[in-house]
Amino acid sequence: FDPSKENLTVIPSVTNEQVDAIIEKIRQAKRPVLNAGNGIRIAGAFDVFRRVADKLGIPVVTGWNSIDLMEDEHLLYTGRAGNMGDRAGNFAVQNSDLLFSVGSRLSIRQVNYDWPAWAKHAFVIMNDIDAEELKKPSLHVEMPVWADAKDLLEKLESRLNEKLADGEVLFKGDEWRQVCEKWKKDYPVVQPKHYEQKSPANVYAFIKEESRRLNEGQITVVGNGSACVVGGHGYVIKKGQRFISNSAIASMGYDLPAAIGACVANKRYCKETGEKEQDIICVTGDGSIQMNLQELQTIIHHQYPIKIFLINNGGYHSIRQTQNNYFGKPLIGIGKDSGDLSFPDMAKLAPAYGFPFIRIDSNDALGEGIEKALSINGPVICEVMVDMDQKFEPKAASKPMPDGSMVSAPLEDLAPFLPEEELKSIMRWSSEE
């Protein structure tokens, strides 16, 4: 098969000159950051990415669809960048003087609506398999690399092996690594305030308590709304885990079919490799699960080991927040607080399908309830009743100005907004030579 004869685009191979230029730019940088996108997974380049990241020795941020590329405890992992990212990841990007992005198209979700302010002090090296993505007006790309991510990373690894001794890293800037590590420690997504209210439970507290109890290598599939956003914000990622979402499409109802697909694929993989099969975790919401509710019977019929954690926030919480932020009362088409629609009682639906059922209605009950659900042999539904007033945070947001106008704040300035002096202190790194 010859793609050129079919008039198909042939992706160019990465040249030695390109690789050497990238290495030299990283070597010269004072505040480099590696932005790791989901194209790395798609290219089958996960293993080589991990080796290259270790050899480069620069802080790593992940994107909206790629949070499982690096575990939270990895020394180089800084955070999650973008308008649904965290503070530490965005502080690193916004203070960087070089951004090396691999396998990410750097969509508006990654660069924000105030895209001229994105990584404005950085020399941007961007890799993507689609040449058109490198030309978008919402980006400044000083060194475009049109290539397959695996080809780029394999050639980088080969060149780094030639240039570096065993155990040596390319970037020698310990101070910058320590600064990024401190941001990660000082600005966690899940905070003590999320545990203060006892009942109902807080969704951020739930996400942390659930995810920290999972095993290395375990697979989580999430629905949309709170499951995707809060999960993407606050999930504790461990080594070898997968976090699967359809965030770019964001259609409700993805959760159950995707969890079934992940379960079947995982069974086949474990059979072929001899690895121990683990339960699949499905985190979804009271709105999303209704879109493909019939798949509960598929799970029961085949006794697929899927643990369903159902976030009950009384309706469509993403829409609730949008209406409250921009329009106010009365709310329309939300759930309990709009009064014009409602959802069935899962305590009655679950046994009708044959599921064991657990309900958690307070922060104090999170640990016991989650552990009970995880310990049950086979499928289970664990419903978590959460606060309807909890907003997604931190999050890119419009900022009110003194004249009453609204402007999109840059990525370093996520809502809830930090005190001005604190933010200035954090951003001082961007002006250092």
Residue ranges and their predicted role:
Residues 1-28, 189:
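Conformationally flexible catalytic loops at phosphate/diphosphate-handling active centers
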Residues 51-56, 111-131, 240-241, 394-410:
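A short, gly/pro- and small-residue-rich
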